[in-house]
UniProtKB/Swiss-Prot annotation:
Family per record: Belongs to the eukaryotic ribosomal protein eS8 family.
Protein transport among keywords: no
Protein name: Small ribosomal subunit protein eS8
Xref: InterPro entries: Ribosomal_eS8 (IPR001047), Ribosomal_eS8_CS (IPR018283), Ribosomal_protein_eS8_arc (IPR020919), Ribosomal_Se8/biogenesis_NSA2 (IPR022309)
UniProt keyword list: Ribonucleoprotein, Ribosomal protein
Family matches, as PROSITE patterns: RIBOSOMAL_S8E
Species assigned in the record: Thermococcus onnurineus (strain NA1)
Record text on subunit structure and interactions: Part of the 30S ribosomal subunit.
Length: 130
């Protein structure tokens, strides 16, 4: 069934709201991208959005742009270490904004939205040994 992002047809009391119009195509939503860590090569998908614009969805990520003190590096993503959005995403290697990923140069926190922006940007985390 389609994902509809319009107003609910129910009132807080549970009563029905009768719409004075039909549902519109612009109110349709889409399934989330669920960007995963790639094993072979990166996979992107171009989606037509409202107004004929385009949005790039990153389906599988192989590299991340990791920034450390203003200097950026393109490094390979190894795995997802932690994800505050959903703990099951760690097991499934799904990258979202705020996820902590393991890269070739260390751990980094994702600052971009891969399913919306089509790229993984991250900031290196300073590891403090106690």
């Amino acid at each position: 069934m389609a994902i509809w992002q319009g107003r609910s047809l129910r009132k807080p009391s549970g009563g029905r709201i009768i719409l004075a119009r039909k549902k519109r195509k612009r109110e349709l939503g889409r399934e989330p991208a669920f960007t995963k860590v790639a094993e072979g090569r990166e996979k992107k998908k171009i989606i037509r959005t409202y107004g004929g614009n385009r949005k790039v969805r990153l389906i599988e990520a192989l590299y991340a742009n990791v920034f450390d003190g203003g200097k950026g590096k393109k490094v390979k993503v190894l795995r997802v270490v932690e994800n505050p959005a959903n703990r099951q995403y760690v097991r499934r290697n799904i990258i979202t904004k705020g996820a902590i990923i393991e890269t070739e140069i260390g751990r980094a926190i994702v600052t971009s939205r891969p399913g919306q922006h089509g790229v993984v940007n991250a900031v290196l985390i300073k590891e403090e040994n106690a």
